[in-house]
Amino acid sequence: MLPVNRARALLTILSQAKTLNHTQQVHAKVIIHGFEDEVVLGSSLTNAYIQSNRLDFATSSFNRIPCWKRNRHSWNTILSGYSKSKTCCYSDVLLLYNRMRRHCDGVDSFNLVFAIKACVGLGLLENGILIHGLAMKNGLDKDDYVAPSLVEMYAQLGTMESAQKVFDEIPVRNSVLWGVLMKGYLKYSKDPEVFRLFCLMRDTGLALDALTLICLVKACGNVFAGKVGKCVHGVSIRRSFIDQSDYLQASIIDMYVKCRLLDNARKLFETSVDRNVVMWTTLISGFAKCERAVEAFDLFRQMLRESILPNQCTLAAILVSCSSLGSLRHGKSVHGYMIRNGIEMDAVNFTSFIDMYARCGNIQMARTVFDMMPERNVISWSSMINAFGINGLFEEALDCFHKMKSQNVVPNSVTFVSLLSACSHSGNVKEGWKQFESMTRDYGVVPEEEHYACMVDLLGRAGEIGEAKSFIDNMPVKPMASAWGALLSACRIHKEVDLAGEIAEKLLSMEPEKSSVYVLLSNIYADAGMWEMVNCVRRKMGIKGYRKHVGQSATEVG
């Protein structure tokens, strides 16, 4: 057989190789017949080893091709292997790209994309700009593969203005390019820009793809646009994207959870075939945050029955449910599960256990967990201060605050929320004012919504309703719903019925979908024996489709 025919035969056999063993057998024949330095066979061997996830063999095969014989195809083959490999770092890709530039004339869209992605991974914007210039020089900056990579590079490393400029200069834009730009705006929390781009893309007549829908549904979750999110879900079903992308399914579930549409989230979750730990955790966390703790526990048990191992985030979420239920037994069972399965506790878990034990009334166990921590940061100290506070142990909370400072841990915004909450639970108005003034003067912590709400709660609990109302009216920022909510709760305690009606109106103008305001106002009128007003409020609830949920508790006594 002529050498050319023999080489072609080996290429055919190599293209049919299915396993690493088959590839090595063909490689042996290539060596025997002296074809190892041939660029076509060498490149094909390199690719075959890459497909078998043996980058070491691929590199060895590539290196046996003489430098003067290597062409763009052979360089792109090895570059693709390094780019896709989980064992190599971005610096290896960039080093290989620089070697190619020294030994091979010209560039193409493939090796430019590999180099740009490596620059993004390494955070090398200046190198990326040089590659952008090279792409422009070779007329490839508007290529269907290169352009999205450049937009992503500027979105990740530069500014969205730069990314938008590159995007605007591209005359023909495909759906990938639109999706990459939307993804960039999502990173910078510019959700309105995502909606704007979607409308512009739709007007061009381009078909939507999974990336576009994922960006759109994430933006819906960020701004709590549940109705729009439902429409996106509908589109993804009609165009069959929902069955093709697990990530899209997970994103829609996350959107429903953020919008508190938990029943919609669970319905989609139940139809998902590949339910991974992220999906389980998202749903469990959603039920826990919405105080539907029993359902969160049911999901957690179902997760374990299906042999899905929980991660640290799952366990932190289920501990929120333990706190919500006030169930020490459930909390201890989770603690025991972690110990039995050798799961190491991180700072988040330690803090979650402190909070859970404190809310279940076992302050001694909360303190034990705190003492077990190998390292204590400002979050763990703040959590312990809060633990003392919610159990009415103000002196211990204040002592913990002073100990934290003695350990050179600087209090932050969360610390003062915990401390002001402790003042509120103990009714210590004087100390509350002292700490509120100190936080800015001594520590540079600017009061936020939660700090103002704590002060309103403190004054309200102490019966200083007028001063609490005056405090809200004179706040340097626009009062948020949490501050008005704290005052409404105080109105119930101190039977300030007229003021309660006024505050409820303000709250409903800010959060018209919040049914808990109607429930609290109804209870205030009921406490005052104003049954006509109770019926009036409940009729409004009925018109809006709200109903009073029966509370669930597992608080243990004895």
Curated annotation (Swiss-Prot):
Spans of repeat PPR: 38-68, 71-103, 108-142, 143-173, 174-208, 209-243, 245-275, 276-310, 311-345, 346-376, 377-411, 412-447, 448-482
Keyword RNA-binding part of the UniProt annotation: no
An MF annotation (GO) of this entry: RNA binding
Presequence extent in this chain: 1-79
A Pfam short name: PPR_2
Primary location: mitochondrion
Record's keyword terms, sorted: Mitochondrion, Repeat, Transit peptide
Location of region: Type E motif: 483-558
PROSITE patterns membership: PPR
Example of a GO cellular component annotation carried by this entry: mitochondrion
Compartments, record wording: Mitochondrion
GO BP of this protein: mitochondrial mRNA modification
UniProt record similarity statement: Belongs to the PPR family. PCMP-E subfamily.
The name this protein goes by in its record: Pentatricopeptide repeat-containing protein At1g06140, mitochondrial
Species annotation: Arabidopsis thaliana
